[in-house]
């Protein structure tokens, strides 16, 4: 039995889950998310919990079991609390600012880089070297944060670039002169 898949998903009172032809729709205070789950996965709702079950113990069903449970649990978490990723900008003259809903990054290129967030994702810039990406869908929040980081990845010598707040940059020693 999948250790992740066999855990029941706790459904808070503020969240409403509807299952229609293997499409799971989760509505909560922060919004609504829907996800299509594989046809072989069995979903049962009982006493404020959602149980995810699989028909057989084949490797294919085992992998889908844990995946489906995690996706639905992330949807429930997203519509109740939401997700956020924090990024930091390191480097002299590197900064971020908002122009309307768009994020404008000045990170050492000859031109500013503009990033337009997709629907359902909010970007905040509390300081000009900090970025916060917020949203209900964990996957989309992670993708937007990765796209921002990819504009100028941190380099290993001075650590300049855009990094996740919790990320540790492994530093290299520069070349030594004779």
From Swiss-Prot:
GO molecular function: rRNA binding; structural constituent of ribosome
Gene Ontology cellular-component terms listed: cytosolic large ribosomal subunit
A Pfam short name: Ribosomal_L6
Keywords: Ribonucleoprotein, Ribosomal protein, RNA-binding, rRNA-binding
Domain of life: Bacteria
GO biological process: cytoplasmic translation
Record PANTHER family: 60S/50S RIBOSOMAL PROTEIN L6/L9 (PTHR11655), LARGE RIBOSOMAL SUBUNIT PROTEIN UL6M (PTHR11655:SF14)
Family: Belongs to the universal ribosomal protein uL6 family.
Function: This protein binds to the 23S rRNA, and is important in its secondary structure. It is located near the subunit interface in the base of the L7/L12 stalk, and near the tRNA binding site of the peptidyltransferase center.
Record's subunit section: Part of the 50S ribosomal subunit.
Protein name, entry field: Large ribosomal subunit protein uL6
Organism per entry: Natranaerobius thermophilus (strain ATCC BAA-1301 / DSM 18059 / JW/NM-WN-LF)
């Amino acid at each position: 039995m999948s250790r992740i898949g066999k855990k029941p998903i706790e459904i808070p009172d503020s969240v409403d889950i509807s299952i229609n032809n293997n499409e799971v729709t989760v509505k909560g205070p922060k919004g609504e998310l829907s996800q299509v789950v594989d046809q072989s996965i069995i979903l049962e709702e009982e006493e404020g919990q959602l149980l995810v079950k699989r028909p057989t113990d084949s490797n294919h069903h085992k992998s889908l079991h844990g995946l489906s449970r995690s996706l639905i649990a992330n949807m429930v978490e997203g519509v109740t609390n939401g997700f956020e990723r924090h990024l930091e900008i390191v480097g002299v003259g590197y900064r971020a600012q908002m122009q309307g809903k768009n994020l404008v990054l000045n990170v050492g290129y000859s031109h500013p880089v503009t990033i337009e967030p997709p629907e359902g994702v909010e970007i905040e810039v509390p300081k000009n070297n900090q970025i916060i990406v917020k949203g209900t869908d964990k996957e989309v929040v992670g993708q937007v944060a990765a796209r921002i980081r990819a504009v100028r990845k941190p380099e290993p010598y001075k650590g300049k670039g855009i990094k996740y707040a919790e990320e540790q940059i492994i530093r290299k020693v520069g070349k030594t002169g004779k």
